[in-house]
Amino acid sequence: MLIFEKSRKNRRTLAHAIADKMDANDIPANLLRHDAPRLPELSELEVVRHFTRLSRQNFSIDTHFYPLGSCTMKYNPRAANRLASLPGYLKRHPLSPAPQSQAFLQCLYELQTMLTEITGMEKISLTSMAGAQGEFAGVAMIKAYHESRGDYDRTEMIVPDAAHGTNPASAAMCGFTVKEISTTKDGDIDLEKLRQMAGAKTAGIMLTNPSTLGVFERQISEVAKIIHNAGGLLYYDGANLNAILGKYRPGDMGFDVMHLNLHKTFATPHGGGGPGAGPVAAGPRLSKFLPVPMVGKNKEGYDWLTEKECPKSIGRLSAFMGNSGVLLRAYIYLRLLGKEGLSRVAEFSTLNANYLMKRLEQLGFTLAFPNRRASHEFIITLKPLTRAYGVTALDIAKRLLDYGFHAPTIYFPLLVPECLLIEPTETESKQTLDHFIEAMEKILTEIKTTPDLLRNAPHQQLINRLDEVKAARELDLRWYPIAKETEIFIQ
C-alpha cells in the first residue's frame, strides 16, 4: 500500500503542530503557497510503521546472500562506516583551505599511493564520481593522447563481445567508432581477428580481465603487443579486479589506463545511484592527462593539484573533489586488510566461485566454459533445461527469491544463451554456499517434475511478476499518485 493511500485529512504529526504555530505574516507574500502541498497526512507512528514495513521487504547484503555476477556484492565492514563518519571528516567543508584539511588530504594521498601500487600504474585521480564516469574519463584520456600527437585518424575503439555495456557507450560518447571483437569458445579474445582488426585507425581496446565470462584472458600479453604495435592503447575496466588483488596488476599486463570500482573491489556501499567513486589510474603514456584535482605532497604538507600544476589534464569531472565519504571508506578498508589481506580477498573469492561452480556442475547444471577455472564468478547456461522443460533463466531467478536468495545476474553476457552469472565473493561462508547449492538442487528437481512452479514464481513475495516490457516502454514515474481516490487529502 502506498503511503498516500493511508492518508487521512487533518491527521497530524508533531511537525505539523510546529508548522501551525508559524506566522505566515513573517514570510513574503510572493513566497507563500496558494494550494496545499500534495503530501500525505499521517501520524508519526503510521509513518514509522510504513517505512519499517518497506525496509523488511528489501533484499540487501546485510540480510541475504547476493550472488549478483559482475557486481561483487561483498560485505561492507561497519568499521569503515564508523571511522569515515568521525566529526572531523563529516564537518569539513569541501572548499576548506588545504592547511585546514591536512588529515583529510593525507588520507587521500595515501589512498592514491596504495591504489597505484595495487594497479601497477604511475598516477591516479580519485575525483570520478562513479565507475562509469571513471571509464568515460579513461577513454577521454586516450582521445586526448592521440590528439596531442596530431593522430586524429585513430577513430576506432575495439570492444569484446562479452564487454560491459558501458564500454561501447563510453567509447561512443568520446566520439569513437566501436569495433566488436569476438571471443573464442574457451573465453579468450580471438587473436587472429584482433590482428586483422588492429591498424592505423585503432585508438585502443577496452578489456576486463578476468572477463565478464568469469575466466582470465590467458593471452593478454599478446593482446597488448598487437595493440601497442598498431599504435593503440589498452583500457582496463576494473569491474573484476577483486579476483586478482595482490596477484596480478593491470599495469604489468600492459594496460595504459583503467578505472576502479570502489563499490565492488574495496567494499564501499552499492546502491541508489550513488554516491560512488571510480578512480582513474594511468601509466606513463597517459598520466599527464588525468582529471583534476589530485592530491600532491610538498615540504609544507599536502595540497590540491589543479589545472595549473597539470596543464595537460582533461579537466574536472565534477564539482569539488570527488565523493570524500566513499573514498575514506575505501581507504579504511585497505588499511584494515593490508597487503596480505588483499591477497586473501583474491584467493577466497576465487575459491568460493570454483567450489560453487563444481558443486552445481555435479548437480547437473551446464557450465558455459567447462574446461576453464573460474576466476571470481562463473556462468551456467540453462539452454538444455529450456529445451527439455521450457523453463528459462528468468524462471530460476524468480524461484530463488522464494528460497531467500537474491537472483544472480541473468542474460548477461549476451553471447551465452539462458545464462546465470554467479559471483559469491570472498565474504560468504561455506555454509551459506551450501545452502544456495541445496536451493539450486531443489529447483532442479522442480524443473523436472513441476516446471509450472517455476514459471509462476515467485510465490512468497508481495509482488509476483511485473510486465517488464511495459514498464520499460511506458514510463510513468511520479512522486504522488494521480488517481482521484488517493488525492482526498489535498481537497
UniProtKB/Swiss-Prot annotation:
Q: Name one Pfam family in it.
A: GcvP2_C
**EC number(s) per UniProt?**
1.4.4.2
Instruction: Point out residues bearing the modification N6-(pyridoxal phosphate)lysine.
Output: 264
Q: What InterPro entries does its record include?
A: GcvPB (IPR023012), GDC-P_C (IPR049316), GDC-P_N (IPR049315), GDC_P (IPR020581), PyrdxlP-dep_Trfase (IPR015424), PyrdxlP-dep_Trfase_major (IPR015421), PyrdxlP-dep_Trfase_small (IPR015422)
Q: List required co-factors.
A: pyridoxal 5'-phosphate
Q: Does the keyword Oxidoreductase apply?
A: yes
SUPFAM superfamilies named in the record: PLP-dependent transferases
Q: Which GO terms describe its molecular function?
A: glycine binding; glycine dehydrogenase (decarboxylating) activity; pyridoxal phosphate binding
Q: Which reaction does it catalyse?
A: N(6)-[(R)-lipoyl]-L-lysyl-[glycine-cleavage complex H protein] + glycine + H(+) = N(6)-[(R)-S(8)-aminomethyldihydrolipoyl]-L-lysyl-[glycine-cleavage complex H protein] + CO2
Keywords, comma-separated and alphabetical: Oxidoreductase, Pyridoxal phosphate
What GO CC annotations are associated with the protein?
Answer: cytosol; glycine cleavage complex
GO BP, one example? glycine decarboxylation via glycine cleavage system
Member of which family? Belongs to the GcvP family. C-terminal subunit subfamily.
How the protein assembles, per its UniProt entry?
Answer: The glycine cleavage system is composed of four proteins: P, T, L and H. In this organism, the P 'protein' is a heterodimer of two subunits.
Question: What NCBIfam families does the record tag this protein with?
Answer: PRK04366.1
Q: Which purpose does this protein serve, as stated in its record? A: The glycine cleavage system catalyzes the degradation of glycine. The P protein binds the alpha-amino group of glycine through its pyridoxal phosphate cofactor; CO(2) is released and the remaining methylamine moiety is then transferred to the lipoamide cofactor of the H protein.
Q: What is this protein called?
A: Probable glycine dehydrogenase (decarboxylating) subunit 2
Q: Name its species.
A: Coxiella burnetii (strain CbuG_Q212)
